[in-house]
Amino acid sequence: MLAPSAEAQYGESELVQMGLESLGMWPDFAAQLERESGVDVDLRRQGTLIVAVDRDDLEWLRHAQLERERLGLAARMIDGDAARELEPHLAPTIPGAVWCPDDHQVDPRRLVQALRSAFEKQGGRLLEGVEVKGVQIEADLAAGVELATGVEALAPTATVIVAAGAWTRELTGLDDAPRVRPVRGQMLAVELGAPPLCEHVIRAPDAYLVPRSDGRLVIGATMEEMGFDPRHTAGGVMDLLVGAWEALPAIHDAPIVEMWTGFRPMTIDSEPVMRRSDSVANLVYATGHGRNGVLLTPLSARRIADLVRTA
């Protein structure tokens, strides 16, 4: 999701501004990436609907809306009837919502496919299925990348970008690695149906629902401090399904087509780390993007490219 308005939280004004800047870059970024890769990343601009499922939720939404207004975000309160005009399958008991018309979404799987294709078409070499153990440091310079199969030596002019996500601190040789921890997210997808169960991204108190062009309705996502445990849990899946059903009861009979887990790379302050290493001259960190990695893709690419060029 590309949703800086919907995901705005107290105490994260700097992160919100980064998100807005990156969101503004997305249309041109997506168009260029699609031209270079030949892959449609499914950029959609339908907006996000944040729904309350009861009166207590509605009061919380009103309170949170004050912060969005303070930040000047494009978001407004609407009543339940107006919400159902946007999404007719919403529960009849929904008392109100916040409408964020400027939020977008993109398919992250297609995005990765497009980035890979563009990278390789421009001469990049991608090593797959090879575990990275760490970075070999010699005389305060990154001299090689340690793989499970051996050391990949680097040219003297090379710059290493550490973009290892939640696994950043698992790499050896990085004494100043940022403090990044994994936060597990369980997700699932059901059949979107025809006509589709929804057209917009819907955020409920305990789940969000994202319609995809490939016919899936993605439902996510838990946030769990469980290390790198990739398993699904009955409670996690139940919470997602109940949270989604409270907002969109029509999912009740939708077939489940997929379940998966991922690990968000979270920092203490929830802000990403995009900087040079303090101790290794030719090493740059790009990690800790948490729940905003896809949103911040264009901005991160530009900032990291600037760091590499000026290294």
Features from the language model and the residues they span:
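Active-site substrate-recognition segment that forms the wall
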Residues: M1, V39-L43, T159-N282
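Dinucleotide-binding Rossmann-like beta1-alpha1 core, especially the glycine-rich loop
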Residues: M1-A82, L86, G243-A244
